[in-house]
Amino acid sequence: MSKQPIITSEEVRGVIRNLLDSTLSAAREANEFEVGRVVDAADGVAHIEGLPALMASELVEFSNGTFGVTLNLDEDLAGVVVLGEFDGIVEGMDVRSTGRVLSIPVGDAFLGRVVDPLGRPVDGLGEVPHETYRELELQAAGVMQRRSVHEPIQTGIKAIDTMIPIGRGQRQLIIGDRQTGKTTIAIDTIINQKDNWSDPEKRVFCIYVAIGQKGSTIAGVKRVLEEAGCMEYTTIVATPASDPAGFKYIAPYSGSAIGQHWMYQGRHVLIVFDDLSKQAEAYRAISLLLRRPPGREAYPGDVFYLHSRLLERCAKLSDEMGGGSMTGLPIIETKANDISAYIPTNVISITDGQIFLQSDLFNANQRPAVDVGISVSRVGGDAQIKSIKKVSGMLKLELAQYRALEAFSMFASDLDAVSRRQLDRGARLSELLRQQQQSPYPVEDQVVSIWVGSNGYIDDIPLSDVLDFERDLLEYLRNRTSILDDLRTCGDLTDALLERLKEAVESFKNKVYFMRVDEREKDPLEDENIGQEELVRSRRAN
């Protein structure tokens, strides 16, 4: 009986081949990154050498665990912006390439959370589960992947929805001096999306990117959104003023990456950049430290590209791409109402319109302090709801004429009856557009309010009583008629609905409002209120 060999030669060769493959694979894994060293480091920027294969925007890791992103690629050196604490970065420190372009985790779990520009939680609620990673420097959607803006996104603010409408996928700039209500408009717009959250077709995912804001301001925004019940559909990307310039530079791109993830899933996104002036200043500081040649106002030559490649990501996608959208509300802070400065003119030329907030109007208690003369929406009119478009057609012109006539009347000794009526109508329309913050108006309420003002139903109402008249009228229509419900359902102010509205307004005004006024005037007054009542009566007589 012959003995069979235990192992054949082919089996031996196979074992050796597998061993060599595993050894080479382990060697490749052990050497998958290169190691360089820091040549110099100062003010949040480090120059490194020994990494010739670095890519633009590649993430590098210093030996102390701090990350940085490559912005400059020279022949021998690479300029890296440190993303995190800079104190531990010293000359001679090892730094390794990661082979990854700067990216952040994204997913639905980010709703209701506060994260930093790297997607790390800063709200103390633990890690954020993520679905995937998304690069920060991805190309925006191409021309053939888009469609025109045709769906409205309601802010709940009468002055904006009627005269400066915004559509889904639009980029609408909010610009004005500090402390004029820019952030308030953005936050009110987020709050107004609450009613749509229960409808999967209408729901809007909101992102608030705080760039260089005070920590107390960011905490205040979060508190307002929590109290309004809006954090469940909102993500806050927080970059306080104490953060390094690198974080302020990448924060808007991080927010847009989170939003693009939802947009390409066919969802609708609203993103607020508060504000891009501080991002431009951070980028200027980084560029000067990287020894890039300065240009106008010491900004680098590519500062326009900084904002254009960011805001171009806001779009309304075609049906073939899922039909999602990302609406951008960038905020720019001006100095002394100068919108002709470098950064404001750049962003105005990139966006699809601007809402200009005037400090004089704000100080005169006209809030929101929208200057309708130079505020414009270039594409939002195509998305405006029919009923609002019908009632607000001449509103912007009337208010612009009122502002001009008001300025003229300061120097005129006497005005004719037509001019005086125009002044009275304009004053009441301006009063009608005043609105408290965090109190958005539904579309149907806006339609009734503007229609009543434009058709002279408040011309004989004392100026101080205009908002009370509006509140009581809307309450009357809500409780006694179905007009508001029909307006909301129909979306158009039909002839039949218009006749019903006329009858209801006249009935309220004659049978309810004036009866209440008469009863109020019959009530006995306290001694200290008699003088005030005489003043009110004299105003009505005039």
Curated annotation (Swiss-Prot):
Stretch forming the signal peptide: none
Keyword set, alphabetical order: ATP synthesis, ATP-binding, Cell membrane, CF(1), Hydrogen ion transport, Ion transport, Membrane, Nucleotide-binding, Translocase, Transport
Coarse class of the protein's main subcellular location: membrane
Record-level Gene Ontology MF annotations: ADP binding; ATP binding; proton-transporting ATP synthase activity, rotational mechanism
GO cellular component terms, A-Z: plasma membrane; proton-transporting ATP synthase complex
Reaction equation(s) it catalyzes: ATP + H2O + 4 H(+)(in) = ADP + phosphate + 5 H(+)(out)
Protein topology in the membrane: Peripheral membrane protein
Site (described: Required for activity): S375
The enzyme's E.C. designation: 7.1.2.2
Subcellular location per the Swiss-Prot or TrEMBL entry: Cell membrane
A Pfam family: ATP-synt_ab_C
Binding site for ATP: G176, D177, R178, Q179, T180, G181, K182, T183
HAMAP family in the record: ATP_synth_alpha_bact
Family recorded in the similarity comment: Belongs to the ATPase alpha/beta chains family.
Function summary: Produces ATP from ADP in the presence of a proton gradient across the membrane. The alpha chain is a regulatory subunit.
Subunit record text: F-type ATPases have 2 components, CF(1) - the catalytic core - and CF(0) - the membrane proton channel. CF(1) has five subunits: alpha(3), beta(3), gamma(1), delta(1), epsilon(1). CF(0) has three main subunits: a(1), b(2) and c(9-12). The alpha and beta chains form an alternating ring which encloses part of the gamma chain. CF(1) is attached to CF(0) by a central stalk formed by the gamma and epsilon chains, while a peripheral stalk is formed by the delta and b chains.
Name listed for the protein in its UniProt record: ATP synthase subunit alpha
Species assigned in the record: Tropheryma whipplei (strain Twist)
Lineage of source species: Bacteria, Bacillati, Actinomycetota, Actinomycetes, Micrococcales
